[in-house]
Amino acid sequence: MKIVFMGTPEFAVPSLKAMVENFNVEGVFTQPDRPKGRGKKLAMSPVKEVALENNIDVYQPVSLRKEPEFIEKLKNIQPDFIIVVAYGQILPKEVLEIPKYACINLHASLLPKYRGAAPLNWAIINGEKKSGNTTMLMDVGLDTGDMLMTQEVDINDSMTAGELHDILMIQGGDLLVDTINKMVSGEITPIKQDDSKTCYASMLDKKMACIDWSKSASEIHNLIRGLNPWPVAYTHYDDKVMKIYKSHVLNENSKKEPGTVINVSNKGIKVACGEGILVVEEIQFPGKKPLKVEQYIRGNSIEIESVLK
């Protein structure tokens, strides 16, 4: 079974490894090397590193639409499947028609919900209790193709986007292998997505990370979980940015102004919200490492009755 794999970040690495272990990977397409770090040295994508370790040919077009020579290379490979996992480019129709069987995409949501760039983050921000991976046939739209297989993951009240990312990342490779085998044996009937049930998971940005304490404690807690590890929800204390990595909700109410620090202890910082109370457990100030509140207050103070903004 000849596979061409297209992917870029760490999330795609277990899927590539699963392809290498189970099929014949004839080529890997990934994004061009990018400047990274203070020295701005060119760095390979995680997918490229794994491809080179396995002596697989690597192709790095800036744009498949504008570099037809890469499409010709794809045609020459004559793949049975093109497998796409967080590649970072929308494939032209000409590419979608190349493989013998299909172009299959692994998407980190239970489609049709959360099409788009940041599905697992928005699932947590919106307080979903389940997420998962979906394999789908690719078409010219954005995550709109027919669904093939899904796998579900429960989201508990403390799970962060980073933790959900790692679970889906590891499980995705197995789902892809299963999908390919069942497509070849004719065991899968593609299912059209119900567009009336879709919602779009837009890219994250730092502007959305500023906490609005007039919202409910549950909403703020979900924002904190959904933006961990990036861009990380934040507020201001004593005119300094205070990032918040972990929290939990108290089923109590306060008549204090939203954002008011009610109490500080080893268990965390109790903060009044528009509805309910949030207990902040892990924080970070500029130039410092993230610390549990218990560690932070050993040498620093957070004033009770101060207002976070």
Swiss-Prot record:
<dbReference type="InterPro" id="IPR044135">
    <property type="entry name" value="Met-tRNA-FMT_C"/>
</dbReference>
<dbReference type="InterPro" id="IPR036477">
    <property type="entry name" value="Formyl_transf_N_sf"/>
</dbReference>
<dbReference type="Pfam" id="PF00551">
    <property type="entry name" value="Formyl_trans_N"/>
</dbReference>
<feature type="binding site">
    <location>
        <begin position="109"/>
        <end position="112"/>
    </location>
    <ligand>
        <name>(6S)-5,6,7,8-tetrahydrofolate</name>
    </ligand>
</feature>
<dbReference type="Pfam" id="PF02911">
    <property type="entry name" value="Formyl_trans_C"/>
</dbReference>
<dbReference type="GO" id="GO:0005829">
    <property type="term" value="C:cytosol"/>
</dbReference>
<comment type="function">
    <text>Attaches a formyl group to the free amino group of methionyl-tRNA(fMet). The formyl group appears to play a dual role in the initiator identity of N-formylmethionyl-tRNA by promoting its recognition by IF2 and preventing the misappropriation of this tRNA by the elongation apparatus.</text>
</comment>
<comment type="similarity">
    <text>Belongs to the Fmt family.</text>
</comment>
<dbReference type="InterPro" id="IPR041711">
    <property type="entry name" value="Met-tRNA-FMT_N"/>
</dbReference>
<dbReference type="GO" id="GO:0004479">
    <property type="term" value="F:methionyl-tRNA formyltransferase activity"/>
</dbReference>
<dbReference type="InterPro" id="IPR005793">
    <property type="entry name" value="Formyl_trans_C"/>
</dbReference>
<dbReference type="InterPro" id="IPR005794">
    <property type="entry name" value="Fmt"/>
</dbReference>
<dbReference type="InterPro" id="IPR011034">
    <property type="entry name" value="Formyl_transferase-like_C_sf"/>
</dbReference>
<keyword id="KW-0648">Protein biosynthesis</keyword>
<dbReference type="InterPro" id="IPR037022">
    <property type="entry name" value="Formyl_trans_C_sf"/>
</dbReference>
<dbReference type="InterPro" id="IPR001555">
    <property type="entry name" value="GART_AS"/>
</dbReference>
<dbReference type="InterPro" id="IPR002376">
    <property type="entry name" value="Formyl_transf_N"/>
</dbReference>
<protein>
    <recommendedName>
        <fullName>Methionyl-tRNA formyltransferase</fullName>
        <ecNumber>2.1.2.9</ecNumber>
    </recommendedName>
</protein>
<keyword id="KW-0808">Transferase</keyword>
